[in-house]
Amino acid sequence: MDAGVWYRSLPRFTRYWLTATVVLSMLCRFDVIPLHWLHLDRSAVFSKLQLWRCMTSLFVFPISSNTAFHFLINCFFIVQYSSKLEKDQYSRSPADYLYLLIVSAVLANIGGMIFNVYFLMDTLVLAITYIWCQLNKDVTVSFWFGTRFKAMYLPWVLAAFEFIFHFSLASLVGIFVGHVYYFFKFQYSQDLGGTPLLETPQFLKRLVPDVSGGFGGFGLPPESRAPPRQATESPWGRGMTLGRN
């Protein structure tokens, strides 16, 4: 497939996310923008009101010869799991997916400030991966060396590899972020009968109207969204510890 055709075929917010990540990271890689201006820094945010760091830390990644593969794998996960969420569960409700990203970004910033995670790409990527895996628990995924297991275990496997080999909490923070969203959006209301707590604000619905027609999975209980599918590849590899400059 032609690269331009493939790029335009990506769902809207996945495409925006991938573009912002690649462009901002490459600008820092070639020293067009100093990296230390963009990473999450609690004291700079609160003492100097450098509020842009809360946004840029979600997209910028410190690319080097040691971390390039890590960066590419994260981009793959954006394309793989963000696309699936946006096209399947949120196909008719793009504003709901935008709100998911906003809530996840806010929680990622809070977790990053608490645990001193300076670059939040891993955190946000794993949060979205976790949500997809919870909504598709029985899908079989393939990991390294041909190992296969249900999707619900994938985030924990990734976080374990990250922590064991790089002593990073970024992925665990991502799981926490994803679980908070999943619990309050789906489990609390559908399984426990609680009042929905993460309803998309109306101004976002007006900004990004729902799509009429078609068949979207959003709004169905997680266990009834889709039957088990064939294995999907997940060639995850880690090359750095988030929080390091």
Swiss-Prot record:
Residue stretches spanning the membrane: 18-38, 59-79, 100-120, 157-177
Keywords, in A-Z order: Endoplasmic reticulum, Membrane, Stress response, Transmembrane, Transmembrane helix
Membrane topology: Multi-pass membrane protein
Any Gene Ontology CC annotation: endoplasmic reticulum membrane
Gene name per UniProt: Der-1
GO biological process, any: positive regulation of apoptotic process
Topology feature Lumenal, residues: 39-58, 121-156
Protein name: Derlin-1
Region called Disordered, residue ranges: 218-245
A GO term for molecular function: signal recognition particle binding
Family per record: Belongs to the derlin family.
